[in-house]
Amino acid sequence: MQVFFPFMKTIKFIASYAVILLTSFILFLNASCSGDDGPNYEFPDTIPTENSKKPRYIWIDAAANFNDFANSKENIARDLTLAKDAGFTDIVVDIRPTNGDILFQSSVAGVQQVEWLGAWVNGNYSKVYRTATWDYLQAFIDKGHELGLKVHAGFNTMVGGNGSTLGNQGILYRDNTKKSWATCDNLSTGITNAMDQGSGTKFFNPANDDVQTYICNILKDLAKYDIDGIILDRGRFGGIQSDFSETTRQKFQNYLGGVTIQNYPSDILPEGATMSNVMAMSTYPAYFTKWLEFRAKVIYDFMAKARNAVKSVNSEIKFGVYVGGWYSSYYEVGVNWASPKYNTASYYKWATVSYKNYGFAALLDQLLIGAYASPLHVYGTTEWTMQGFCKLAKDKTKGDCPMVAGGPDVGNWDSSNSVSQDDENQAIINSVSACMDACDGYFLFDMIHLKMANQWTYAKQGIDLAIE
């Protein structure tokens, strides 16, 4: 994720529960008086959770909020109180932004504390320096727990640098020996290392064993904090053109059983092909679908390692991931967040029969779904509606992940600036019940948007209506 700027339910629930209990008791008595060949009645293993008991997460992007929080515990206390008063139960505080530096303590070699982040200040994109010496993450933990909020650490995963007009940051810029960690993209000009492509976020190659070890070691240090959960963001490949390094080529050929791909990379993906090109293909190159399967396995295996790393330090920390809800095209970044019980190949031509095996939902304690639809598309059953994203996510995860929460990006949802402010405000209100009714919780990105447009009251109205 990235920030850009430009009723009567409780009574019904209790009544329904009482009917279930009474019916179960009567059937128990009948069964006790009957023979073995009587009817076998089955009942749901769980009773639907009331919305009031479902978590409501708000994400706190590091860069976007840095001007407020980098050096002020008072501002942290102020805004966490606003989140609590609005009805949010959980915060996700970003402590490893896209440059790959950190806002907590770690002894892993090569890791560095964030010195500055680029943020919009009074209409100008500027450097915001961190001069405070107190522990950034610990400040959120202390105040969050004091307020009764659960505190999760948001962790940008497969990133190692960021270059902009303000300057370059991250281990990939600081240490030239780590260039092989950077992803190599299949461009029209040839396979090119990310560090030779100019500015922007620099992704690691997820298939690189050294990268995986580096990330897992950092996660172990993060797990030493008294946090309630860890949410991995960008736990993925950089895009459809990634990764075509020799490291990944050899691993893929081994995955194929030792096959040598003669026309590399065109037998997988034509040089420079984009997602638009891929989605327009009537037939795929020879190894394309197997390549998608392989990439999904790479991410599955990494997620298993990351979970083990966290749990080895503190088994009580909830391990989670943020993903985009657009599953139909999320193969672009090599991620299968569904359950292995969801047979992807039955629905999508790009999926092999074995693609489903690398759905990682069962590895998670919590899954945040970006239900990033337009404010004009809150309700529905399909992708690109908020409610549809959440319903589909629950179906695809098949109960493997016990907590699936989804919700909107309330700042980047109207790229054409065609929706009125009143409609946006109403969409925030409506989004809460639309998403919470469809899954296990609500998730809003990002705190900065509620602050900038003074929209806390609409989030509160939506939460109050959803849980009444």
Give, region by region, the residue ranges found by the protein language model.
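Active-site-adjacent "subsite" loops/lids of carbohydrate-active enzymes
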Residues: 48-70, 153-225, 280-288
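Glycine-rich, aromatic-flanked loop segments that form ligand/cofactor-binding clefts
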Residues: 90-99, 136-195, 231-234, 315-320
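Substrate-binding cleft of secreted/luminal carbohydrate-active enzymes
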Residues: 354-468
